[in-house]
Amino acid sequence: RGRPGNRGSYAALYLTGPEGSAKSTNTKILKSIVDPGTPETRTPGSDVRDLYIGAARCHVLNLDNLSHITRDYNDALCSIISGGGFARKLNYSDDEEMIFEACNMIFINGISIKLMPDLMSRTFQIELAVIPEEERKTEADLWQELEKLKPAILSGILTALSNALKEYQKGFITPPLPRLADFGKFSIALERGNGWIEGKTLEALKNNYEDGLE
């Protein structure tokens, strides 16, 4: 999906944790709420072009069970989060290009992935704990319960976004913003519009980045 003229950037979500912490399941659940459709998850292909092709067919690029991220994929993910493009010479042509553009939300999960600093600065990292045996559920039971809860979940999300948009449209002075300035400003509007503690989202993003550098 190319970037509409007035849309800013996203932040990535990285779920990590040991085996049995439901990393894949959690990203599937999140995607099913904000971007239902198939495939639920993707694995990186052999070429960064595959990322852009996949991004063009969804709103959330959900990358499952990654073990490492190469420099090329790191750069592509940063570009997709911020809204960018990738060009390649058109087959059987000497002077024509095929252009891929994308601006997508990205979910990543894996046991222990070392993110490079530029991607880390755009990412919220959450470490999950192992689910105790007595609390485990079958996929069928889990999804059945989720379907019952989805209307209330979506109602809460849409109400929060509506409050944020009202606040955003008022215009306000912001504190110093991160490199994801559009995301940062909207996060403040989200907090103000819903009566949440202001600055907590940007504080979490900053702490994630600093922890990732250690």
For each of these PLM feature ranges, what is it?
Residues 41-49, 66-68, 84-102, 109-118:
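Conserved Walker
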Residues 19, 63, 69, 166-214:
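DNA transaction DNA-binding modules
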Residues 115-134:
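A short helix-turn-beta junction within AAA+ P-loop NTPase domains corresponding to the substrate/partner-engaging
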Residues 3, 31, 35, 74-98, ...:
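Conserved catalytic/switch belt of AAA+ P-loop NTPases
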Residues 1-57:
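P-loop NTPase catalytic core of nucleic-acid-dependent motor ATPases
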Residues 10, 37, 57-59, 84, ...:
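Short glycine-/polar-rich loops that comprise or flank the Walker A/P-loop
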Residues 59-81, 112-121:
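Conserved AAA+/SF3 P-loop NTPase catalytic/coupling segment centered on the Walker-B
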Residues 128-146:
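A short, charged helix-loop
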